[in-house]
Amino acid sequence: MRLCDRDIEAWLDSGKLGIDPRPPVERINGATVDVRLGNKFRVFLGHTAGFIDLSGPKDEVSAALERVMSDEIILPEGEAFFLHPGELALAVTLESVTIPDDLVGWLDGRSSLARLGLMVHVTAHRIDPGWQGRIVLEFYNSGKLPLALRPGMLIGALSFEPLSGPAARPYNSRQDAKYRGQQGAVASRIDKD
């Protein structure tokens, strides 16, 4: 059962759930909290690799990832990031989120953006118990026109679901937590699997 708006506010008030900066009550709706787009992005570079063998040797996968991902792009205030049709890019939420060990979070895109062809998360929309950091967005433009994305715009909504008990292995306590504490648009670390 997902938390309703009153329960989300109570979890925030108690400090068990953290969203920084804390959203105003107007962005806590029914069963979700609206989140905004941050100013950090990463894109795939031109065809610098014919393919990435995801099950290949870790050093080869790592080298291929280095060749295909840009450095982090930090947009100055007031500028837009343009996502062209058929392009995939990474970005982050403006808000940093701290989820306790007995709660799981879910990120959904906004219907208004989906109707323009913008996918906010390609497949990874679960936010694990014990998560701390910004949420990386996997943008894909499936529409026909370029989309101008500006930091600070509403980009998605978070919902939260209590677990039957605290997780035995919450994300931030795991040694294999590849994205622990991320604050930027961290590229895939599949080579760390």
UniProtKB/Swiss-Prot annotation:
Region of interest: Disordered: 170-193
EC numbers: 3.5.4.13
Keywords annotated in UniProt: Hydrolase, Nucleotide metabolism, Nucleotide-binding
Pathway(s): Pyrimidine metabolism; dUMP biosynthesis; dUMP from dCTP (dUTP route): step 1/2
Keyword Nucleotide-binding: yes
Active site: 138
The organism's place on the tree of life at top rank: Bacteria
One GO molecular-function entry: nucleotide binding
Pfam families in alphabetical order: DCD
This protein's record includes keyword Hydrolase: yes
SUPFAM superfamilies assigned to the protein according to its UniProt record, in alphabetical order: dUTPase-like
EC class: hydrolase
Catalytic activity: dCTP + H2O + H(+) = dUTP + NH4(+)
A Gene Ontology biological process term: dUTP biosynthetic process
Binding site for dCTP: 110-115, 128, 136-138, 171, 178, 182
NCBIfam families referenced in this protein's UniProt entry, alphabetically: dCTP_deam (TIGR02274)
Subunit and interaction comment: Homotrimer.
Described purpose of this protein according to its UniProt entry: Catalyzes the deamination of dCTP to dUTP.
Family label: Belongs to the dCTP deaminase family.
Protein known as: dCTP deaminase
Organism: Yersinia enterocolitica serotype O:8 / biotype 1B (strain NCTC 13174 / 8081)
Source lineage: Bacteria, Pseudomonadati, Pseudomonadota, Gammaproteobacteria, Enterobacterales
Name of the gene this protein is made from: dcd
